[in-house]
């Protein structure tokens, strides 16, 4: 029994340290140094939460930029069902999904160039991706501008404005947050697209 006391004391100490002190300390430091990120990077407009800068949303209207397809089951962009489709690149079902998406994208974007950006036809690993490359966003500009009756140049300027660049080139590539961009389009016109 004497040998159990140090083991029990060590276990209790580590339980309090890793189960109490460490989580409370990291939460407090996160709230202090990075409050926006620690609270989910929520986007507020008119004192209402419109979304998160980290999770994509399903935009299907012609007047909105469309993000990557969601691989979440039942409901698109469901954060509770996050995960990829798990279909191998050699799986015929994946090929059929991509071909179907490409055909739908070409039909919805008749003014766009013939080459559909790959990220618009393939789901991300999480199924919740909120970012596109500037090229994939630019590919959709003619459709969005026509649906909103805005000059193409004005929509292109908005895409450029909402393109986030990494601190250094080797840290990643520029991306456009589709949720932020679509909210900016709504703010520009003072209403939601149809």
UniProtKB/Swiss-Prot annotation:
Question: Where does the record say this protein resides?
Answer: Cell inner membrane
For this record, an example GO cellular component is: plasma membrane
Q: Which GO terms describe its molecular function?
A: ATP binding; P-type potassium transmembrane transporter activity
Enumerate the transmembrane spans: 12-34
Disulfide bond positions: none
- Which InterPro entries does the record cross-reference, listed alphabetically? KdpC (IPR003820)
How is it placed in the membrane, per its record? Single-pass membrane protein
- Record has Cell division as a keyword: no
Q: According to the lineage, what is the superkingdom?
A: Bacteria
* Keyword vocabulary terms for this entry: ATP-binding, Cell inner membrane, Cell membrane, Ion transport, Membrane, Nucleotide-binding, Potassium, Potassium transport, Transmembrane, Transmembrane helix, Transport
Presence of the UniProt keyword DNA repair in the record: no
Function, as annotated, reads: Part of the high-affinity ATP-driven potassium transport (or Kdp) system, which catalyzes the hydrolysis of ATP coupled with the electrogenic transport of potassium into the cytoplasm. This subunit acts as a catalytic chaperone that increases the ATP-binding affinity of the ATP-hydrolyzing subunit KdpB by the formation of a transient KdpB/KdpC/ATP ternary complex.
Record text on subunit structure and interactions:
The system is composed of three essential subunits: KdpA, KdpB and KdpC.
Query: Family, per the entry?
Result: Belongs to the KdpC family.
Could you identify this protein by its name?
A: Potassium-transporting ATPase KdpC subunit
């Amino acid at each position: 029994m004497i040998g159990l006391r140090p083991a029990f004391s060590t276990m209790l100490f580590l339980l309090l340290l890793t189960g109490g002190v460490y989580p409370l300390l990291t939460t407090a430091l996160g709230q202090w140094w990075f409050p926006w990120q620690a609270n989910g990077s929520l986007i507020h407009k008119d004192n209402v939460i419109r979304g998160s800068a980290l999770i994509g949303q399903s935009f299907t209207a012609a007047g909105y930029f469309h993000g990557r397809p969601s691989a979440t089951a039942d409901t698109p962009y469901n954060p509770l069902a996050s995960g990829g489709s798990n279909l191998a690149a050699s799986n015929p079902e994946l090929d059929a999904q991509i071909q179907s998406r490409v055909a739908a994208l070409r039909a919805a974007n008749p003014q766009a160039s013939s080459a559909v950006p790959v990220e618009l036809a393939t789901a991300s690993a999480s199924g919740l991706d909120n970012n596109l490359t500037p090229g994939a966003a630019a590919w959709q500009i003619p459709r969005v501008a026509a649906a909103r009756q805005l000059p193409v140049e004005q929509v292109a300027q908005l895409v450029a404005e909402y393109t986030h660049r990494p601190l250094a080139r080797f840290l990643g590539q520029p991306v456009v947050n589709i949720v932020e961009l679509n909210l900016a389009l709504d703010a520009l016109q003072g209403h939601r697209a149809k």
